[in-house]
Amino acid sequence: LLVAKEPAMSMIRDLRAVVRPSRPSLRKDGGAYDTTRDPGTPSAVVDCAVYRDGARVDIGKPLTPHEAMRLVRRDGGFVWIGLHEPTEAEFAVIAREFGLHPLAVEDAVQAHQRPKLERYDDSLFTVFKTIHYVEHDQLTANSEVVETGEVMCFTGRDFFITVRHGGQGSLRALRHRLQDDPELLARGPSAVLHSIADHVVDGYVAVADAVQDDIDEVETEVFTPGRKGGVSRGVDSARIYQLKREVLEFKRAVSPLLRPMQLLSERPMRLIDPDIQKYFRDVADHLARVHEQVIGFDELLNSILQANLAQASVAQNEDMRKITAWAAIIAVPTMVTGVYGMNFEHMPELHAKYGYPAVLAFTVTVCLAIHRTLKRNGWL
């Protein structure tokens, strides 16, 4: 058991270990993790395994973090522990075992952190935001286009700990892929950190492509001519605002991660294998491209929103012109009938034989002339 120096871990030692009811979690072999686990193991642990020479060490039963670390100290290798939304008391057990810094522990438990990289004496603390695109057939009136989660990583010389928050960003498939690549896994905890960074950024790329399709669709609708080649009436601005809100959330995940990826790819670090560090450059390059896309999305949506509002304004002006044109046409018969509705005694045309049809013909002729003139000028 590792004991951190005072006063760094004083607040951690005061936390009481509280165990939540066991939550089933399947291992790769299909067995339920929680059925045979030591009752003292925190229930937030999704998986706990020791890896030696790129292979998972199988001792015939699930390991507790303490047992896993004891195996590593005795026989070598490293331990990888995955947790999902642990409480302070649950994570205190892990923090004491691995000597994690209290500030990093606090961030890992509380969540809602910006993507970042923090270096401590014996570990690196990295925060990633995961992004998941919600398909349109799954959207509701109050749902979001993208959903976010968090993955926090503690990288040490002989341990790697992941703390996941939110329903997205499961690392089970990634762990299985790494177990199928012993050569890479043999590189140790830094190889796992790179794989998670690459996995998260690949998710950004996929979401960026999907959001691009949504923006293209909205842009097409905004600039599609209206009926009979008329002015487009635009689209519901709420949809554009929804996309802008989701792009902003996307930007909050991507932009702060640029600096950590740059540090991991360029600055030598004691806990990062130099050979693995080269691969962080590829991740940083992909992240930079996604960041450029997200910035472009924001600017494009601003332009689309302005164009949509302009289209709506033009359409309203067109409606007002039509209303005005018809009002001008209707004014003629209104005026004529108004004149002959007055009760004057001397109105000579009232006694003319063809006075009535003449007035009707005059009214219709004037209305037709006005209609033709307005139509020629584009008011109708």
Where are the predicted features?
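Peripheral, non-transmembrane regulatory/ligand-interaction domains of membrane transport proteins
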Residues: 2-296, 349, 379-380
